[in-house]
Amino acid sequence: MEANLRRNYTTNLTHGVFGMTGFRLIYAPTIIPAYLYLLTGSAAAVGLGTALLQLGGTVSPILSGAQVESRKRILPYAITVGSMMRVMVLVLAIAAWTLEGTALLVVTLASFLLLGFFSGAQRVAFQMLMAKLIPIDRRGRLQGIRNMVGGLIAAVLAWVAGHYFIEQQWLGNGYATTFLLAFILTSVGLFVLRLGIREPDAPRRRPAIPLRERIGQFGDLLRHRDFRAFLWAHGLAAIARVGLPFWTLYVGDRLGLDGALIGTLSFAFLAADTMSNLVWGSLGDRFGFRAVYLGALISSLVGMLLLVLGEGWLVYASFVFLGFGFSGWMMAAVTLVLEFGEHEDIPMRLALTTTVEGGMSSVGPILVGLSIAALGYAPLIVAAFASLLASLALMLWRVREPRTSA
């Protein structure tokens, strides 16, 4: 690990900045919901699109974990699934320019499903790469710097996309232009990763066994008390995350949804997401990522309170707190899980965590979209508060810090 640490650290950072910048334009809870709402005029359709994006990432992590846990080298596989993920973003752009009506909606939804599938596979592969290449006490800072720089650029680009690309219909379709920009940025990052990484052989590997047999061994992973409780807490937090794409529509109902509002909310969310990353990363390196997870849940609760009760500038402040919470939640989820149990079980722990998260996030948006159409936003608000509080209670009383409990 130490022999090529400086090179691998720099390469991971550069790849992460480009990838984070591009994919934040896709995954920020503003642009995609607004795009689907433009195509359909339906909150239920926004829920379906978000659900497909998450559903694709529900099954693939387990398949990806089975692929990487018995390999000496993970990089070739990671490049393959990463490339396919970027192709799906390009398909979104081409479809937006060349199709219309039902054909455009069908291709867009299919692209979301496949984008989610390859995203789930990539997440397992790339986090396993980090576990091999970067020491545990430097992962937080690496992710913090990567997310801060990439997120800051993404926040500015999201503002530009809303106020110029979308509002002024650049190149004939502002959303297509935004998707194309995301494809270019993420592809540059993947190219840097392919050329720069020097990956050592895995220190320990599981023997290759049939997938069905490996799935049957999941019970062994769940015997780890803290990991089992963490999965429950993470699943509950994922329920609250389901609401993120709908909060833009919620604010839009109150203030009027247009390109300028989309750009401003995107900037508030992504800028907060960005600037908080160094704080979360340093906190995680020093005190452990359980503390980061707790802080992220508290920040999300504050954001929800401001969103529901606030007026004027407090509405924009709510997106700042939601962005702060989201960044900490994402960083802690993918880093804390690396520290439970044995090294050779990391791929499947990542797979289980991502599958639980994806399962909650795939069913939820459909139910939320239908609920909003029938009953308004009140059921979503109650469910988000309840799940965040339950997750916080589990993390406080059932999950120990793995660095001190081993």
Predicted regions span which residues?
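Helix-loop boundary and gating motifs at the non-cytosolic
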Residues: 1-59, 68, 75-78, 85, ...
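Juxtamembrane intracellular "pre-TM" segments in multi-pass secondary transporters
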Residues: 1-6, 199-232
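Transmembrane alpha-helix termini and helix-breaking/packing motifs in multi-pass membrane transporters
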Residues: 33-38, 66-70, 93-99, 154-173, ...
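Intracellular juxtamembrane helix-capping segments at the cytosolic ends
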Residues: 119-134, 328-342
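Helix-loop junctions at membrane interfaces in 12-TM secondary transporters
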Residues: 9, 94-111, 308-319
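Helix-loop junctions on the cytosolic side of multi-pass membrane transporters
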Residues: 175, 190-207, 396-406
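Helix-to-loop junctions at the C-terminal end of transmembrane segments
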Residues: 60-73, 165, 276-288, 372
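Structural signature of the two symmetry-related core transmembrane helices
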Residues: 76-92, 183, 291-306, 385
